[in-house]
């Protein structure tokens, strides 16, 4: 199990107009000690992520070459996302051009797993049949494309409120039961689950039980904390996710992927001169999380008692 982070840990600046270039971010993330990165292709609409350029393949070759040079593997990526089942979505035109590029780009960098969001069909009945059917039809061509480029797709758990058209009861695949059911319907080897611990915390899910149910379906993670109210994307132990209880289950189920931070809000509002020091702190917290995940932490003490 490697310690990884989304490239967005060193990306946006407080004005959300300025940014650090991806190649620079990768060098800095390696310098503070991360083992691997998640290429955040969901930033494809931003000027620092040049997937929309005419020469995007040349740029992606630079990214892949730097990954090799730094010995910083790109062990997962995150495709652009929107609710693909929402009729007449204004985002569809751009993102449906970018998603195939994201898959090909991931193949160029030998990325094993591409994370994608499922969609929710508007006004779906409580049996979720239409959402499931349409997600199957949506993902199947992308799974075939990913297979051609040597990649798999890890479908991510959602949380209520992620769609402007909500079905009764919330958003599809906001529970591990729905997600496992969808993944099992494909009957192909290059599909799995990305478990977002922060999303699950918003849903109040028993994450220990959820991980056990997912088992070998689990291929990737998004590690972030929150208070249970908003999807804050902050450093673990700054919210109320019970990491000490949850993470040891990863070794119990034989999880073979990485612990991957998605905590851009821990750095995005900081002045430039504090970003690297904060990223280094995140790396230290990540090492402790790895110890928890490998069930190496026992009989902790917490300072002095009165």
Residue ranges and their predicted role:
Residues 1-7, 29-39, 145-159:
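Conserved long hydrophobic alpha-helices within structured protein cores
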Residues 58-62, 68-73, 83-192, 202, ...:
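Active-site acidic/histidine proton-transfer and metal-coordination neighborhood
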Residues 1-35, 68, 96, 165, ...:
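Histidine-acidic metal/acid-base catalytic patches
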Residues 12, 45-50, 83-88, 122-126, ...:
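A short acidic, helix-capping loop that chelates divalent metal ions and anchors anionic groups
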Residues 38, 76, 115, 154, ...:
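Conserved beta-strand positions in the central sheet of alpha/beta enzyme cores
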Residues 9-11, 41-43, 80-83, 118-122, ...:
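Active-site-proximal loop/turn and secondary-structure-junction residues that shape catalytic pockets
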Residues 14-17, 51-55, 87, 91, ...:
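Pocket-edge positions in alpha/beta enzyme catalytic cores
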Residues 38-63:
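Glycine-rich, proline-tolerant flexible connector loops at the mouths of alpha/beta enzymes
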């Amino acid at each position: 199990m490697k310690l990884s982070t989304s490239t967005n840990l060193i990306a946006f600046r407080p004005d959300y107009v300025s940014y650090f270039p991806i190649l620079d971010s990768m060098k800095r993330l390696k310098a503070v000690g991360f083992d691997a990165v998640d290429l955040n292709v969901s930033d494809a609409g931003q000027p620092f992520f040049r997937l929309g350029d005419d020469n995007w393949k040349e740029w992606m070759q630079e990214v892949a070459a730097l990954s090799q040079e730094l010995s910083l593997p790109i062990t997962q990526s995150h495709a652009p996302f929107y609710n693909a089942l929402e009729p007449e979505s204004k985002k569809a035109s751009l993102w449906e051009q970018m998603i195939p590029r994201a898959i090909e780009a991931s193949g160029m960098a030998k990325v094993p797993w591409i994370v994608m969001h499922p969609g929710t069909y508007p006004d779906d009945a409580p049996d979720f049949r239409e959402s499931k059917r349409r997600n199957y039809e949506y993902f199947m061509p992308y799974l075939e494309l990913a297979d051609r480029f040597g990649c798999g797709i890890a479908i991510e758990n959602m949380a209520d409120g992620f769609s402007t058209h909500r079905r009764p009861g919330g958003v599809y695949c906001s529970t591990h039961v729905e997600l496992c059911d969808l993944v099992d319907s494909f009957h192909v080897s290059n599909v799995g689950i990305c478990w977002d611990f922060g999303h699950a915390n918003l849903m109040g899910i028993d994450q220990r039980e959820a991980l056990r149910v997912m088992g070998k379906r689990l291929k990737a993670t998004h590690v972030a904390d929150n208070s249970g109210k908003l999807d804050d994307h902050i450093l673990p132990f700054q919210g109320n996710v019970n990491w000490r209880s949850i993470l040891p289950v990863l070794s119990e189920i034989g999880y073979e992927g990485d612990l991957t931070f998605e905590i851009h809000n821990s750095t995005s509002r900081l002045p430039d001169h504090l970003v690297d020091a904060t990223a280094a702190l995140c790396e230290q917290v990540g090492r402790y999380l790895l110890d928890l995940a490998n069930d190496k932490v026992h009989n902790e003490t917490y300072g002095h008692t009165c």
